[in-house]
């Protein structure tokens, strides 16, 4: 935990540059905006960030993939472990894409699932936990963040799985049994609505029964101001990508 610039400087002596600073409190509006410190020149920005709340300073880990896992548990101890999915940042698409399945060595995927089960069972959680992992090119797995509840990235389950992560979480909280999970497609790519052509999205919404559409209007916003994701499903990631290109749903 760091609460002052002096704490940051002291920690940097041990972990070195680059490193990144992130908030510990979920209620802060910019909680997901981590600050990367490359040199002492970034101390001023670090000071501004710390002024808003307690932070954690961590070493920068060069990772090959950001892999997320959502696990749901009810009070009976039943578990529903969703398949790991990859979060991808691309210069061609604004925002974060979610891709399923993620290519992982069998041992790496087994360890990710084991850690997810261990955390949920150790905490005796009733509800949903979403864990972000950093996976290096050598197959080393680091836990990057743990959040109670389904993250936005879990929206891909609305079109790709027989039971969405959100519905499973509600079932767990109200004490209902958790059914078996069945993938509805071999692959899926979830695209943030902000990166898409709204007119083309509405066209596909009227035509498609095989895609998922997680569209909602935030409270207090203009009725036409939608947010969410479009989940493109297919036989493979390449097939999903081809559909994205053919339907021309990406903004130019």
Annotate each PLM feature.
Residues 1-68, 72-122, 234, 238-248:
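Active-site nucleotide/adenylate-binding loops and adjacent lid/helix of ATP-dependent enzymes
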Residues 68-70, 130-134:
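Short, surface-exposed charged micro-motifs
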Residues 111-131, 147-195:
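Active-site "cap" helix and flanking loop/linker of ATP-utilizing ligase/carboxylase catalytic domains
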